[in-house]
Curated annotation (Swiss-Prot):
Species of origin: Saccharomyces cerevisiae (strain ATCC 204508 / S288c) (Baker's yeast)
Protein known as: U1 small nuclear ribonucleoprotein 70 kDa homolog
Location within or outside the cell: Nucleus
Gene responsible for this protein: SNP1
Complex and partners: Component of the spliceosome, where it is associated with snRNP U1. Binds stem loop I of U1 snRNA. Interacts with mRNA.
Keyword Nucleus in record: yes
Coiled-coil parts of chain: none
Swiss-Prot/TrEMBL keywords: mRNA processing, mRNA splicing, Nucleus, Ribonucleoprotein, RNA-binding, Spliceosome
Domain RRM positions: 107-198
Annotated phenotype, changing K148L: No splicing defects. Associates with U1 snRNP
Function noted in UniProt: Involved in nuclear mRNA splicing.
Note: Present with 736 molecules/cell in log phase SD medium.
One GO biological process term: mRNA 5'-splice site recognition
Predominant cellular place of this UniProt entry's protein: nucleus
Compositional bias (Low complexity): 265-279
Amino acid sequence: MNYNLSKYPDDVSRLFKPRPPLSYKRPTDYPYAKRQTNPNITGVANLLSTSLKHYMEEFPEGSPNNHLQRYEDIKLSKIKNAQLLDRRLQNWNPNVDPHIKDTDPYRTIFIGRLPYDLDEIELQKYFVKFGEIEKIRIVKDKITQKSKGYAFIVFKDPISSKMAFKEIGVHRGIQIKDRICIVDIERGRTVKYFKPRRLGGGLGGRGYSNRDSRLPGRFASASTSNPAERNYAPRLPRRETSSSAYSADRYGSSTLDARYRGNRPLLSAATPTAAVTSVYKSRNSRTRESQPAPKEAPDY
């Protein structure tokens, strides 16, 4: 577009003058027609032939990949562990276990996360309140005869086992000495396809794991893992506006009267109200209305 610069002053027309052309610079690359590979370039086979020959004679099988051996060991250990669990699972049958033979699974409860120094007599004191107990068995190691931290209790009445499970349960727990123990039903003979934790199953984590470990440090320290020690006190009653905590300057009656109880006349039934009509507008029409009108170029 050509502009008539004669109508502008000299200081303004000087701003619209074209710039000088770019200076010529010699290209750094060769032209496309003259490009070619250096004919003096040769391979490295002659240089490495002697070195490679000595290396292959010294290491005929190559050096071991030690950084990959660790991954292979972990992979093999997982495969062996899975095969071992499969063999143990095939031999596991709770219905033929001599320790629980001739017992009703619906009258039996499972107690986990027990203290390791707890015996049957002390355990009976915590569950005798639910009903008469027929049998208590704390599972122990066959070699060391030490407790494994869980036990089974058989009641004489199935209602007693249901009451113990509903009152204590898995989430609430019961405190025995310095540990929070859980109570569950016997799932080995009542739940199909159930596997114990030692065979790759189970329903939860360890007792020493923190329940609030996913929280940040300052929140996890304030919370407690014992549900019985948590504070479930009701909230304080809502304060009235007349209390000393609320100043009269902010929530006083004068502000409310001036804002919500002014001297505006109330609408009565006889007062005519304007009819509200809604006109539909498409999206394109609303866009055109919101856009400003184009400015016309001045004609000097």
